[in-house]
Amino acid sequence: MPTGEILLNLKKLNVLGSVLYVAAHPDDENTIMLSWLAKERKVRTSYLSVTRGDGGQNLVGSELSDLLGLIRTQELLAARAIDGPEQYFTRANDFGFSKNTDETMQIWGKEAVLGDVVWRIRNLRPDVIVCRFPPDPRAGHGNHSASGVLAEEAFKISGDPTKYPEQLKYVKPWQAKRVVWNTFNFGTVAQTQKPAEKDWIQVDIGVYNPLLGKSYNEIAAESRSQHKSQGFGVPRGRGARPEYFVHKFGDKAEKDVFDGVDITWNRVKGGKEIETIINEAIKNFNADSPSTIVSNLVKAYKMVLNLEDEYWKNQKKKELENLIIACTGLYFEANPNEYSAASGEKINVTTILIKRSDLPITLNKIRLIGLSRDTTMKTELGNNELQRITFPVEIAKGQALTQPYWLAEKKMGKGMYRVDNQELIGLPEKAADLQAEFSFTIENQVFNFNTPIIFKYTDEIRGELYRSFEIRPEISVNISDKVYVFADNQAKDTEITLKSAKANVSGSVSLALPNGWKAEPASIDFNLANKYQEQKVIFKVTPSSKDSEGQIQVIAKTANGTFNRGILTVAYDHIPPQTLFPISEAKVVKLDIKFKGKNIGYIAGAGDEVPAALRQIGYAVTMLTEKEFNEDLSKFDAIVVGVRAYNTEERLKFYQKKLMEYVEKGGNMIVQYQVNNNLQKIDGGMGPFPFKVSRERVTVEDA
């Protein structure tokens, strides 16, 4: 932690306030406001994104839906690491654009998602709740307005113990002081829609922070540019930035958003003495020798442990621990020799530890949580002396798989992810099951610091990198397609890829099929001698004689049990690799298809999987490159333009004339979803007759 940040966080110790910012999606948040709240006002700041952005588009790859939500979760965490707040979610799924609140609430399930918002309020105990959107059509999107409705209703009931009483096993009711709307710039709001002047307060959030060497505009630009899958890179702004808080419910603020809220140590019994010690630490702080204030920090830490207020005790305990680590120059980590392992496998975990200060510190012990290793040491740490200790360990039988917790089970319908563990609901990620605990004595006080066991590796271009240590099933089974369509009674090849997570895995694999369907052979044996080895096998699947549909599931059996999960890793340079293990299954459909034409020319768009679906039905699909455009297009019965192709494919403006000639001669051309942002400038427009692409959307998916 740089010394400027240390001093900033020292000052933050004296602030006992909390704010919750609520919106619908990743990238809805006002990153300048969040940065200002966290680093200028120094209150505990949290962003609750009702969804993970699963329904958006993907400008960096082909992942959509759940996998896009996984990417955008990591992008939000990267953003929060820059601008400072904590990140949370509900179980709601972003199902795409919605024109009104009622539709959104019906699909999400209002009572469930409202309960998730109440749960987060009771956990975070915000003094102020800030809505990004109003609860009405001005929000411009049903998800947006729904987030405003949820925030306001949750504010009204989160302090009522009769509402969602099952939560009270873990949290207490909490009543925030007020709800405000962080409104849009009034210059863009119609006069009739503007709130009365007395109902809002104005703040300048574009100020400069000399401890960080940046303004909040600049910090927020770096933060917002983490939304790379949405193409949200923005320039750094500088200068004054007026923002507005419009009063909605609760006690009205007259001058400051925290009016009437004591955000000093006076709000907790025994806090005044702690404030005095922290002020001494701030006064004595020396950027050339941060360890000189550790004695003050430890003294404050001991007093915090005796606070009656559990919420602020836990919060300030965590803040003090982070500062003590920074000021002592402590660094510690625990790295396995493999990035993944399977149940029962033996690996090595190496702990690395160093202290970069002259302050006396004793290492008491190292404990590997979840791996049954506990080593007592009582070692005095020297200044800048690196210590490595390697522990041979065995992964426990039945150790839980490492994957995004909200994707471990199938969704509860279209609008809600299934999460049965109440304490996990809303967390961006589950804490690592396998951790290393380092126990130190500092200034006669024992500290136990935990860190996840995490794999470290070096990329020759990007340098040192980290990825989560994964527990995998000993055998994973991936099916090649998500859907198999049979237009006749002919058998189709179904390819299965088996992958081992450890050495010497053998057994058999088979398909579970709907009634009337058949696979040949009935099962196939496999024997994988090496870790990460793959083997491909093919079943010939024959459909039912009648039109029908159903699911096929892949099942592998070994001496250690039955396995039915595939493996999928999402990897991009801007996020850590994310691995999940979905149930290995596919939809099978037998139906009578009437073809009119068979040859399709296809222009790929962003994240495009439509060509594979067309081939699955039985069409011959040719991807149109420069070579095909220089040939006769009349051989195609239709030409299909992929999603956002006119936004992402610059070459289209050069080929548009030839495409229109194809249409003029009677050819069929289908253009899928395009947006007016970054649309290619094409002479004559996108079609045979003039038209403009608006921002209006067709959203009834089942029409």
Segments from the language model and where they lie:
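Structural motif
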Residues: 20, 130, 637-642, 670
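Extracytoplasmic/secreted cell-surface and envelope-processing proteins
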Residues: 30-31, 56-58, 97-99, 138-141, ...
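Long beta-sheet-rich domains in secretory-pathway and surface-associated proteins
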Residues: 337-595
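Aromatic-Pro/Gly-enriched surface loop or interdomain linker
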Residues: 562-642
